[in-house]
């Protein structure tokens, strides 16, 4: 079963919560579209009073998406600033969330570039695939989240 998940700009849900911009890549090999956010980039989204912890140097930080391993919780943050909402597709296929983004060749600061990526994440046990939502911030951060599956109601007690 395939369930398309619409990508919505986050201002549709909460227009009063702008995020500070992420740093733009300065060199061609720094363009990590479709990869997860680095720890330092996530910290830039929070005030220092909320994140006063030690940050690893970017050379040692893992460029993987932030995916919690808590059972019944699913959340992914992806940097997709090089794509427009129309160029991004998020789908639920079985027990996986698939993200595909593609744009044709267009000019950028280094010449011309065409980009495409596919990412697939397995939903952890206890997560409802029908509850997957996604939102795109004005800065190009794609947030994909899923709520835990609702707890099954206990069987009704027999009447005495």
Swiss-Prot record:
GO biological process: chaperone-mediated protein folding; negative regulation of apoptotic process; negative regulation of cardiac muscle cell apoptotic process; positive regulation of angiogenesis; protein refolding; response to heat
Sites bearing Deamidated glutamine, chain numbering: 66
Domain sHSP, residue spans: 55-160
Consequence of substituting residue 3 to G: Increases homodimer-based self-association properties; increases chaperone activity
Modification comment: The N-terminus is blocked. Phosphorylated at Ser-16 by PKA and probably PKD1K; required to protect cardiomyocytes from apoptosis.
Gene3D superfamilies assigned: 2.60.40.790
Keywords from the UniProt entry: Chaperone, Cytoplasm, Nucleus, Phosphoprotein, Secreted, Stress response
InterPro entries registered for this protein in UniProt: A-crystallin/Hsp20_dom (IPR002068), Alpha-crystallin/sHSP_animal (IPR001436), Alpha-crystallin_N (IPR003090), HSP20-like_chaperone (IPR008978)
Segments forming a coiled coil: none
GO cellular component: cytoplasm; cytosol; extracellular region; mitochondrion; nuclear speck; nucleus
Highest taxon listed in the record's lineage: Eukaryota
Stretches for region Involved in stabilization of the HSPB1:HSBP6 heterodimer: 1-72
Modified residues annotated as Phosphoserine in this record: 16
Cell compartments where the protein resides: Cytoplasm; Nucleus; Secreted
GO molecular function: protein folding chaperone; protein homodimerization activity; protein kinase binding; protein-folding chaperone binding; structural constituent of eye lens; unfolded protein binding
Family assignment from sequence similarity: Belongs to the small heat shock protein (HSP20) family.
Cited function: Small heat shock protein which functions as a molecular chaperone probably maintaining denatured proteins in a folding-competent state. Seems to have versatile functions in various biological processes. Plays a role in regulating muscle function such as smooth muscle vasorelaxation and cardiac myocyte contractility. May regulate myocardial angiogenesis implicating KDR. Overexpression mediates cardioprotection and angiogenesis after induced damage. Stabilizes monomeric YWHAZ thereby supporting YWHAZ chaperone-like activity.
Self-association state and partner proteins as the record states: Homodimer. Small heat shock proteins form high molecular mass oligomers containing variable number of monomers; these oligomers display a very flexible quaternary structure easily exchanging their subunits. Heterooligomer with HSPB1; formed through oligomerization of HSPB1:HSBP6 dimers; subunit exchange leads to formation of at least two different heterooligomeric complexes, differing in variable quantities of HSPB1 and HSPB6 homodimers in addition to HSPB1:HSPB6 heterodimers.
Protein name as catalogued: Heat shock protein beta-6
Organism field: Homo sapiens
């Amino acid at each position: 079963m395939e369930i398309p998940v619409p990508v919505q700009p986050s201002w549709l849900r909460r227009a009063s919560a702008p995020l500070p911009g992420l740093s733009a890549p300065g060199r061609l090999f720094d363009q990590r579209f479709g990869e997860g956010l680095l720890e330092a980039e996530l910290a830039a989204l929070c005030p220092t009073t909320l994140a006063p912890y030690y940050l690893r140097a970017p050379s040692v930080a893992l460029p993987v998406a932030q995916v919690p391993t808590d059972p019944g919780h699913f959340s992914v943050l992806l940097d997709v600033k090089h794509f427009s909402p129309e160029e991004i597709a998020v789908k639920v296929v079985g027990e996986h969330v698939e993200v595909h983004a593609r744009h044709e060749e267009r000019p950028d600061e280094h010449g011309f570039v065409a980009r495409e990526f596919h990412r697939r994440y397995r939903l952890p046990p206890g997560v409802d695939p029908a509850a997957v939502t996604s939102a795109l911030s004005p800065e190009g951060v794609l947030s994909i989240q899923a709520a835990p599956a609702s707890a099954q109601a206990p069987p009704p007690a027999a009447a005495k």
